């Protein structure tokens, strides 16, 4: 920071990239779950140090985002990174945490008058819950009032299109 390096670049090109590399090492069986958890702790410490230096974009006009990890999944590294980016973008972020019951996503979109709903999962076994949430939004007449963003390792454009999400990461 003192040398002129942007905090966001440090997060994206340093911490996120490092976590991605750790993930690949885990896939290649060079890292164990304990190694990934240590890397995640280091990444969170780095984000905490850089977060106060992020330039906040105040163009979001007080928009609200609801974010959480879908029911049945407790992997929240990606969710926490997206949360930081949304906050940096000027959004009010309502973080539901991990292993969030499907109905809670819909209830929170309604009670918070959310502009964006972000759902995350790292597991293929919990992906279908995202589609259930989108259908529940339709049933309550909320789907056209909120942008739905889904993300996680198993998520593809095909899946996002299939369930009616607006975008994926």
Model-identified regions with their sequence ranges:
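Alpha-helix N-cap/loop-to-helix initiation residues
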Residues: 32, 74-75, 126
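Long amphipathic alpha-helical segments
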Residues: 1-57
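Short acidic-hydrophobic, aromatic-tinged amphipathic segments that line or gate anion-handling sites
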Residues: 167-169
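Long, low-complexity, intrinsically disordered polar/charged segments
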Residues: 54-69, 134-138, 144
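Cofactor-cradling patches in redox/metallo enzymes
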Residues: 82-89, 94-165
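Glycine-rich active-site/cofactor-binding loop and its immediate structural neighborhood
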Residues: 60-96
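Surface-exposed alpha-helical interface segments used for non-catalytic interactions
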Residues: 12-13, 41, 80, 84, ...
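Short glycine-enriched loops at secondary-structure junctions
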Residues: 16, 70-73, 99, 154
